[in-house]
Amino acid sequence: MSLLRNRLQDLPALCLCVLVLACIGACQSEAYEGTPSPPPKLKMSHWSLVTGRMKELLEPVVNRTRDRWQWFWSPSTFRGFMQTYYDDHLRDLGPRTKAWLLKSKESLLNKTHSLCPRIVCGDKDQG
């Protein structure tokens, strides 16, 4: 128990140290913001090598896929797709949303009223 009491007495000093360290860290990060980054040759790390290799492997695949799907992104095809999607899914979105909200509201009110006598009001039969 005395160990816990000693630690509680040291808590304000510990908080002060943490606050001072946080301020020092913030001041140092502000000081480093204006310094230029190291040249790219000095920046090379294992992760940058992995990233470079992945980019090297995936770039041809991405380019081939982009070339194959180029027909889809032409204005007439894309416009047709969007018009069909709108007609199928979004044209009556406003009325459907309003109906869903009203139904959800009624359902929630019914559940609330059914719970009220048991929780808040007690049973009406025991009056």
Swiss-Prot record:
Protein origin, superkingdom: Eukaryota
UniProt keyword terms in alphabetical order: Lipid transport, Secreted, Signal, Transport
Major localization class: secreted
InterPro entries: APOC4
Entry GO terms, CC: high-density lipoprotein particle; very-low-density lipoprotein particle
UniProt-annotated location(s): Secreted
Keyword match Signal: yes
Residue ranges of coiled coil: none
Signal peptide range: 1-27
Transport listed as a keyword: yes
BP-aspect Gene Ontology terms: lipid storage; lipid transport; positive regulation of triglyceride storage; triglyceride homeostasis
Role according to the record: May participate in lipoprotein metabolism.
Family that this chain belongs to: Belongs to the apolipoprotein C4 family.
UniProt protein name: Apolipoprotein C-IV
